[in-house]
């Protein structure tokens, strides 16, 4: 945790380097940049954000940093699929498990939800209608989900 009143976040961008380059070549922003911008705009003065790209070979936390040093983790969406069998997927699932073990609050959407579910021992199923991007339909909350503070 930070020693001052300003929060320190770890932004984890799950896109592969090739996927990030493809986004940029098409004029889109890299997901991590969007998350950092939002956290800095909405956070208190002095909010700090570190970014890692765990799909990149050799990716690691900044020198001297540990997951427990962060006030929160924000995990971006990405174009990967939990079913791909790619080595970077397994690395990211294990990173989520470590975040869970450390007890650091985390937020994520889309891709982050898939790997968090798998990391926690749950199952993710292929959508029989194909991939959905940006909009998901027919999702219902369990009793546990409805009890989460987010929905109070």
Residue ranges and their predicted role:
Residues 1-94, 98-102:
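N-terminal beta1-alpha1 cap of cysteine-dependent amidohydrolase-like domains
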Residues 14, 121-152:
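Pocket-forming structural segment of enzyme catalytic cores
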Residues 60, 117, 134-135:
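Short secondary-structure boundary/hinge segments and terminal tails
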Residues 84-87, 118-120, 128:
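Short, conserved acidic/polar surface loops in the N-terminal third of protein domains
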Residues 100-123:
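Catalytic nucleophile loop
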């Amino acid at each position: 945790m930070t020693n001052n009143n300003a929060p320190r976040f770890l932004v984890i961008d799950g896109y592969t380097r090739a996927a990030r380059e493809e986004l940029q070549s098409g004029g889109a922003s890299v997901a991590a940049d969007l998350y950092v911008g939002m956290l800095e705009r909405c956070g208190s003065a002095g909010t700090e954000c570190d970014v890692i790209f765990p799909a990149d070979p050799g990716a690691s936390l900044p020198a001297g940093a540990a997951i427990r040093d962060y006030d929160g983790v924000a995990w971006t969406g990405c174009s990967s699929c939990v079913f791909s069998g790619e080595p970077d997927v397994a690395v990211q699932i294990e990173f989520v498990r470590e975040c869970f073990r450390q007890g650091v609050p985390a937020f994520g959407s889309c891709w982050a939800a898939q790997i968090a579910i798998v990391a926690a021992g749950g199952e993710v199923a292929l959508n029989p209608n194909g991939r959905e991007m940006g909009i998901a339909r027919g999702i219902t909350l369990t009793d546990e989900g409805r009890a989460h503070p987010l929905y109070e």
